[in-house]
Swiss-Prot record:
Gene3D superfamilies: HUPs (3.40.50.620). Pathway: tRNA modification. This is tRNA-cytidine(32) 2-sulfurtransferase. It is an enzyme of class 2 (transferase).
Length: 298
């Protein structure tokens, strides 16, 4: 764990310990559910200087110290040469906690500013350039896994962005093969809420570095979706949890993709399809009602 918790009051320390245990449990569960980290892995943790990647590194360090599975960690930061970037912050922090690290200097900032018109979203190109550099570094370091700091809210935002603007039911997977086909990319924070990570980063007093390249783009589509999800979370408790659960409860027979379900070959006599012609029921009927409905089918 980081150094911030020791400076808290007893009550704050109790809450911080509870939060750390919850996050560690969620990360451990995600790792187990998707077989993210295996014995002997060398995990390259991509550290941006933001709250999420700090929390990711801290929690993985905690799991490394207590888990039966033996794996290595190395932190990697890409210095994109953004104006005003405090180059000393990450090396000082990583040295202070005894974490092996590598700082990679690559001026992707100038490339993005040159190619993207003023006022347009830079995130897509910036991300593409950053991925290419990180894949190369993973090769150089002999990393078997690349760990990114995307969390539950990022996954939900991406789901809605694809739905609203891409015409796809698609989001960030917890584990994937990289674009170059040579690396396994993992997202151990997949089950963690952003607000929990923000609270944890504040409690641990991580030396946060703001992103000057894209952080001020308030009108970009992702920011609009983020704010919408935050409003839903306040107004409709449990909605985000249900949305996230739906990503683990897919029923191809009740969608419209014939590549996932054989609608052409659908025939009677093979038994009912799960949920049949029931499109949506907000909650199960009482047992007596279910029995009556069953009798009406006969």
């Amino acid at each position: 764990m980081g150094t911030g918790i020791e400076m808290l009051s007893r009550k704050e320390q109790h809450n911080a310990n509870k939060l750390h245990k919850r996050l560690r449990r969620l990360v451990g569960t995600a790792i187990a559910d998707f077989n993210m980290i295996e014995s002997g892995d060398r995990v390259m943790v991509c550290l941006s200087g933001g709250k999420d990647s700090y929390a990711l590194l801290d929690i993985l360090r905690s799991l490394q110290a207590h888990a039966a599975t033996q794996f290595e960690l190395i932190a990697v930061n890409l210095d994109q040469k953004q104006p005003g970037f405090p180059e000393h912050v990450l090396p000082n922090y990583l040295t202070s906690i005894g974490m092996p690290f590598r700082i990679v200097e690559q001026d992707t900032y100038s490339v993005v500013k040159r190619l993207i018109p003023e006022g347009k979203t830079t995130c897509s190109l910036c991300s593409r350039l950053r991925r290419g550099v990180l894949y190369r570094v993973a090769d150089e370091l002999g990393a078997t896994k690349i760990a990114l700091g995307h969390h539950r809210d990022d996954i939900l935002e991406t789901l809605l962005l694809n739905l609203f603007h891409g015409g796809k039911l698609k989001t960030m997977p917890p584990k994937l093969v990289s674009d170059d086909g040579k690396h396994i990319v993992i997202r151990p924070l997949a089950y963690c809420k952003e607000k929990d990570l923000a609270a944890y980063a504040e409690m641990e007093n991580f030396p946060i570095i703001p992103c000057n390249l894209c952080g001020s783009q308030k009108n970009m589509q992702r920011q609009v979706v983020k704010e919408m999800l935050q409003q839903w979370d306040k107004k409709f408790p449990g909605r985000l949890e249900n949305m996230f659960s739906s990503l683990q409860n897919i029923q191809p027979s009740h969608l419209l993709d014939s590549s996932l379900y054989d609608f052409h070959g659908l025939k009677t006599g093979n038994g009912p399809v799960v949920d049949g012609d029931r499109a949506f029921d907000p909650e199960p009927f009482e047992p007596g009602v279910e029995e009556l409905l069953s009798l009406n089918k006969d």
